[in-house]
Amino acid sequence: MEAARKALAVVAVLGAGGGVGSILFALVTPGELQKQLMLQEMPERDSRRRDEAVRTKELVMATLKDAAATKENVAWRRNWTVRGDGRSA
């Protein structure tokens, strides 16, 4: 009988903890309007940020292409925008 009482107490405590956690989660999550505002403020929505990301990806891809075409270890370059032959990427 004592084991059943302890098991019931454990189940009650765990259930209460789960209930409190669920209620707190429901209180903290943003509403639909707040989600829309957060999405509008994301950095990817800014055209300057997008252009900068595209340029960075282009530089990385040019560096990888250059690294594949040469035996030089391009990872040790101080300036990745300049190729080994002195031209700009």
Curated annotation (Swiss-Prot):
Q: Indicate yes or no for the key word Transmembrane helix.
A: yes
Q: Where is this region: Mediates lipid-binding?
A: 23-80
Could you list the residue ranges that cross the membrane? 8-28
Cellular localization per UniProt:
Mitochondrion inner membrane
According to its record, what are the GO cellular component terms? mitochondrial inner membrane
**Which InterPro entries does the entry link to?**
UQCC3
Q: Which UniProt keywords apply?
A: ATP synthesis, Membrane, Mitochondrion, Mitochondrion inner membrane, Transmembrane, Transmembrane helix
Topological domains on the Mitochondrial matrix side lie at 1-7
Q: Indicate where this protein is primarily found.
A: mitochondrion
- Report whether Membrane shows up as a keyword of the record: yes
Query: Recorded GO terms, molecular function?
Result: cardiolipin binding; phosphatidic acid binding
Q: Which Pfam families match?
A: UQCC3
Coiled-coil ranges per UniProt: none
**One GO BP annotation here?**
ATP biosynthetic process
UniProt topology in membrane? Single-pass membrane protein
Top-level taxonomic group: Eukaryota
Provide Mitochondrial intermembrane-side residue ranges: 29-89
Which modifications occur after translation, per UniProt? Probably cleaved by OMA1 under mitochondrial stress conditions.
- Annotated PANTHER family: UBIQUINOL-CYTOCHROME-C REDUCTASE COMPLEX ASSEMBLY FACTOR 3 (PTHR36465:SF1)
Subunit structure and binding partners = Associates with the ubiquinol-cytochrome c reductase complex (mitochondrial respiratory chain complex III(CIII) or cytochrome b-c1 complex). Interacts with UQCC1. Forms a complex, named COMC, composed of UQCC1, UQCC2; UQCC3 and UQCC4; mediates MT-CYB hemylation and association with the first nuclear-encoded complex III subunit UQCRQ.
Protein function: Required for the assembly of the ubiquinol-cytochrome c reductase complex (mitochondrial respiratory chain complex III or cytochrome b-c1 complex), mediating cytochrome b recruitment and probably stabilization within the complex. Thereby, plays an important role in ATP production by mitochondria. Cardiolipin-binding protein, it may also control the cardiolipin composition of mitochondria membranes and their morphology.
Assigned protein family: Belongs to the UQCC3 family.
What this protein is called in its record is Ubiquinol-cytochrome-c reductase complex assembly factor 3
Protein species of origin = Rattus norvegicus (Rat)
